[in-house]
Amino acid sequence: LHTNSVIFAFVGNGIFAGVYYSLPRLLKTPMWSRVLSWTQFWSWQAIIVSAAITLPLGITASKEYAELEWPIDIAITISWVLFGINMFGTILKRREKHLYVAIWFYIATWVTVAMLHIVNSYEIPVTLWKSYSGYAGVQDALVQWWYGHNAVAFFLTTPYLGLMYYFVPKAANRPVYSYKLSIIHFWALIFIYIWAGPHHLLYSSLPEWAQTLGTVFSLMLIAPSWGGMLNGLLTLRGAWDRVREDVVLKFMVVALTCYGMATLEGPLLSIKVFNAMSHFTDWTIAHVHVGALGWNGFLTFGMIYYLVPKMFRTSIWSKKLANAHFWIGTLGIVFYTIPLYFAGFTQSLMWKQFTPDGYLVYKNFLDTVLQIQYAYWLRALGGTLYITGLFFMVYNVHRTVRQGNFLALEPAEAPAAEKSTGKESTGGYWHRWIERRPIQMLVFSLIAVAIGGLVEMIPTFLIQSNVPTISSVKPYTPLELQGRDIYVSEGCYNCHSQMIRPFRSETERYGEYSKAGEFVYDHPFQWGSKRTGPDLARVGGKYQDSWHFYHMLDPGKFVKGSIMPPYPHMFEKDIDLESTPRKIEVMRQLGVPYDESFIATANDSLLAQAGRIADNLAKGGIEVDKQKEIIAVIAYLQRLGTDIKVKPAAATTTTTTTGN
């Protein structure tokens, strides 16, 4: 819910507000359709409300940045298409010959987000609010992080770069520092960014060549990213004295600084030695919030403080309150991120520390959790400060609107034309040609962003050796499949990974490192990206059924110091037996080798296995109905990692072992 609120509600509405304000002024024409503008606005708010309702109810696809289920995915597609039609309708009827740099980023954003959303949302519905991903295991992970990384790139970055190229020059009353640099920045950024997704999967079961591509292109990203940051900051040349007094410029300078910090740190974290330390820790959480709070948040605030007085023909109601917002927001970012950086360093060091005799110092994962709880309290303080500043802005804007007079129609504006060099008569810069042709800009942008995805995904989907199989790995039983779906709906993937990396510290703690062939029936994959709790890839058979029963009932009481919430409803709610045949049927459509005849008898198999687990619990004095959800969850957890725990005589040649 938190992630989707930031992306769809906070950043999404910031994008649309900025585009709907800047686009008519850059093109010297009103938006093409007021009806489409309002329809798109209300449809987007409906999507936000639907996310706020469905996610807490456990209706989730479990794919990071793409958790929303298939009906909402369709609604997102429709709303995005409406936005695109309106944007291109406005561009095509423009009264300005050339497209300004901000519009290049708007166009690339629209076409790339459309491509990412359609490809990643390939799923087969099971019920109205449940679907299974069309991809499995390694393939699903690659597609997801091709999407996930580029959701950050083309929803949290490129549209905001477009807004930066409009609002920073307007607020500073200065032209963009370098037109040529903006060209290089744009094309290099959109081409390189799309390749970098695999850096989220380093040391995983993803093929090594794909991981290497992700690392190389991530490092290359530093150049265009910093080119854009410098182009923005150098636009303020001659106006730095105003930064002390102008709250709009203050917000924008900090936003650009945070953008530079995040886009340097991100590529550095794609270097394997750093990634080995940062992945699964709070270091990553700190990193993304420098971008979300500093770059997206502060640029949005600066934009609002600029455009609201313009729209209502007045000055901001209270400059002191706006400055208070700036400083309390900055403190909020500091208190939010710095403790999480320290928590991340602590987690990594504790996870990897061995005694002189070669044993893990902190064998119990909970030791790390207890050590960093201070960081979560400081994070809460930082978030409170940041939200308090936001309320300052809301009140300030409210009073500004009340004292002003809304300007319904404003004379359109555009940046001053560049001084003629005489080259225009003979064709000018090569880029001038494409700046006058929005459809060609759209097509070339699509080609630039599609290349990387095709190169990374086609081999993984077509070359079988990239996803090796293990003969002992079998599909989930109906009960385990139901348990897996409950695991997903409860959001367990947010705190637990299912990917053991090939480090001695991890194999000592969790067991043998994960193989690609283990996940061929996982629709969707559950590798995770954060360990608030221990990895579960090899948890099957590690504890008795009764341990899982009591642990799910009251984790804090059963494991002293645990911050895991209890799940009492699992002990009251029955398994949805009616959905079992449909789930097996959809899995068959996705290529999971269930016999067709098994669909009709799936619930018989489910109840038989559930009965065995209930009988086993009864031996320990635990009486529970075999149809309760907790039985399915126990079945799923006890299955994890057991397929490759076979006797030596039954082991296949594709299964390898690690030695210490």
Per-region residue spans from a language model:
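Post-cleavage N-terminal segment of exported redox proteins
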Residues: F406, E410, A417, G422-Y476, ...
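The canonical Cys-X-X-Cys-His
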Residues: G483, S489-Q498, H548, V633, ...
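Electrostatic cytochrome c docking/interface patches
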Residues: Q464-V488, P502-F503, T532, K619-E629, ...
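Surface-exposed patches in mature extracellular/periplasmic domains of secreted proteins
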Residues: C495, G561-Y567, I644-T652
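Hydrophobic cores of alpha-helical transmembrane segments in multi-pass integral membrane proteins
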Residues: L1-I59, P71-I91, I103-L128, W145-A171, ...
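Extended amphipathic secondary-structure runs
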Residues: T388-T400, G533-P534, Y543-Y550, K619-T658
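Sequence context of c-type cytochrome heme-c attachment sites
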Residues: L1, S5-V6, A141-L142, G427-E435, ...
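Electron-transfer interface patches adjacent to heme c in soluble/periplasmic c-type cytochromes
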Residues: S445-A450, E508-E629
